[in-house]
């Protein structure tokens, strides 16, 4: 079992229940999924860029990403409908907790000039989105083998009903908020 999953089940559930004043342990919010998204701007002109992004995402997430395609043509961006423009991965279960552990314990401390995540990035329903500017903060990505620096979006979807519940959950997992 993943370290953070067992920590959540054994200690954090009770701690969050008391902190939020919930009556039942089943009301305690939990993380349902983590979605990683990497948009590759120049993928419409150069197919190799997308292959590099897929390789990086596979190394980071531990599973093969699905290639995202443009929903409609936009002349200003020089893309057509159905052209590949990025990739995404949805993590659930054990892999989700393993990724969260690596994110909190290894990747976040390696971010340059990091002063904590903004508490304003909650969506009103307890879900949290954050952006990572460089994929090299993850130890799985070999610095010598990358073709360019890419960023990614990380969305943590929770079962929380409000931002306060979501913040309490992520703080218990060790997320550094400002």
Swiss-Prot record:
Classification via InterPro entries: Ribosomal_uL5, Ribosomal_uL5_bac-type, Ribosomal_uL5_C, Ribosomal_uL5_CS, Ribosomal_uL5_dom_sf, Ribosomal_uL5_N
GO MF term list: rRNA binding; structural constituent of ribosome; tRNA binding
A single cellular component GO annotation: ribonucleoprotein complex
Database matches in Pfam families: Ribosomal_L5, Ribosomal_L5_C
Keywords: Ribonucleoprotein, Ribosomal protein, RNA-binding, rRNA-binding, tRNA-binding
Any one GO BP annotation for this protein: translation
Known role: This is one of the proteins that bind and probably mediate the attachment of the 5S RNA into the large ribosomal subunit, where it forms part of the central protuberance. In the 70S ribosome it contacts protein S13 of the 30S subunit (bridge B1b), connecting the 2 subunits; this bridge is implicated in subunit movement. Contacts the P site tRNA; the 5S rRNA and some of its associated proteins might help stabilize positioning of ribosome-bound tRNAs.
Family: Belongs to the universal ribosomal protein uL5 family.
Subunit structure: Part of the 50S ribosomal subunit; part of the 5S rRNA/L5/L18/L25 subcomplex. Contacts the 5S rRNA and the P site tRNA. Forms a bridge to the 30S subunit in the 70S ribosome.
Record protein name field: Large ribosomal subunit protein uL5
Phylogenetic classification of the source organism: Bacteria, Pseudomonadati, Pseudomonadota, Gammaproteobacteria, Moraxellales
